[in-house]
């Protein structure tokens, strides 16, 4: 069976021009124009997807099969090209019958051309083949356009679905162009409207809890540059100005507030003799607020000192992936569950914006894992957000799972985040010592997001930083009142 790609090569049909015309028409469609105006960040992401569309269209045209009738006509045309004029005259009746049987668009015109000329000359032979070739080119071009039109409809339908999804999630997950591009890539999965409403729901909840959102942003920015001092430095001299009492007689230079009784102004001293103002006098004396004369009796001089030269290398700490462990015990249900899920959604937003990875582990009696920044990140996020917190608390298993993950090369610079109320049993000694080793030797950092004010200090002492977000009723009312 003849392929369309082979036919295009044989007839010198330019498929690239047809593909470019189709893509330009697609990008100029009213649906995309409105979408680009509403979500400018996603415009660049969709434009970056054009090479993939172009390659998919090329592959579709390359693999497409030519209809049997057109294949047979092309084969007949190729054989006719090899015939001399006398041979062509002999084969002409059979060629005309074949064209008629195949319902070729060239059949009627070919018969009219032959009937209009009583003698078949070499020039007529050449003209017949040229017009036949033009007819085949028109048929091949039409076939290309039909296939591209089918692909355009399918591609437009796919793009519209992804635009709907990305448009809904862009305000929630896309903080910059990088995040918008990754969001567009993740929108390629087969998702229904009811599925991604989980993300919309928790995005709205996160907006209602600005303190929780700020907490996630602070945690995301927590790995800043640090200075590393060098101890093998030499001494250097430096000059500084020091203030010393002057040897010249003092002179009145103005007024000041102090507790210097010897230099009190007469009005201040007069209040001491009034019974009603006596306590006021002593109060101002204690607070050094009595008006006194300011005397000029100090001078500055230059002093030469020595100090070690300390060079500092400013080592920008890489912002690595997030490994987030979420407590799914019964005590983390209700409002705690909403806050934990919304916090993970905020970390996902940060990971998309900064091109980082975000790996979620739910710990109770077993470990469930989700990667929110991968190609299937939206589907993984939906599955995570639809989970219910009804298990037990096994914090030791959580730490063991984190430490196992940190051993791999791709997670060597990850930050571990544990979200819990930390109402649990103490950690085993082997877990505690292993965590301290990771902190000391490999510079891994462990963050705690405490959802309760009653977490056990013995457990939380192991973390490098504790981010507190009390979900108690009193704290919730105070936050609402401050807003």
Curated annotation (Swiss-Prot):
Q: What highest taxon heads this organism's lineage? A: Bacteria
Alphabetized, the UniProt keywords read: Chaperone, Cytoplasm
Complex formation: Homodimer. Interacts with RavA.
Q: What is this protein called?
A: Regulatory protein ViaA
Q: Which family does it belong to?
A: Belongs to the ViaA family.
Q: Where in the cell is it found?
A: Cytoplasm
Q: Which residues form a coiled coil?
A: none
Q: Which residues cross the membrane?
A: none
Note the CDD domains from the entry: VWA_YIEM_type
Against InterPro entries, the record matches this protein to: Uncharacterised_CoxE (IPR008912), Uncharacterised_ViaA (IPR023481), VWF_A (IPR002035), vWFA_dom_sf (IPR036465)
Q: Does the keyword Cytoplasm apply?
A: yes
**Name of one Pfam family that matches:** VWA_CoxE
What is the annotated role of this protein in its UniProt record?
A: Component of the RavA-ViaA chaperone complex, which may act on the membrane to optimize the function of some of the respiratory chains. ViaA stimulates the ATPase activity of RavA.
Q: What cellular component GO annotations does this protein have?
A: cytosol
